[in-house]
Amino acid sequence: MKINQPAVAGTLESGDVMIRIAPLDTQDIDLQINSSVEKQFGDAIRTTILDVLAHYNVRGVQLNVDDKGTLDCILRARLEALLARASGIPTLPWEDCQ
């Protein structure tokens, strides 16, 4: 999936996450996480984000994640909404989701 434009998904409310994405000129993933629960769940948050990006074959992006203690399922949903917005596709290929 190609990221064509910057996009935002989520809120800064307690129990939610706000994620910003922007395309990069390289194939790197620049991931910056700011979380109120980073010491306890930072590795799990990072793993979830990288898993979703790998699933949709996303490279060459900058991600800024402001986590306020969100659940894994919400993090995944916010990421999928963000990817759809940033790539300009109207819907994700749900049949490919497992």
Curated annotation (Swiss-Prot):
Single GO cellular component term: cytoplasm
Chief localization: cytoplasm
Keyword annotations from UniProtKB, A to Z: Cytoplasm, Phosphoprotein
Keyword hit for Phosphoprotein: yes
Modified residues (O-(phosphoribosyl dephospho-coenzyme A)serine): 14
Highest taxon listed in the record's lineage: Bacteria
Compartmental location: Cytoplasm
UniProt record similarity statement: Belongs to the CitD family.
Function: Covalent carrier of the coenzyme of citrate lyase.
Subunit and partners: Oligomer with a subunit composition of (alpha,beta,gamma)6.
Protein name (database record): Citrate lyase acyl carrier protein
Source organism: Shigella boydii serotype 18 (strain CDC 3083-94 / BS512)
GN (gene name): citD
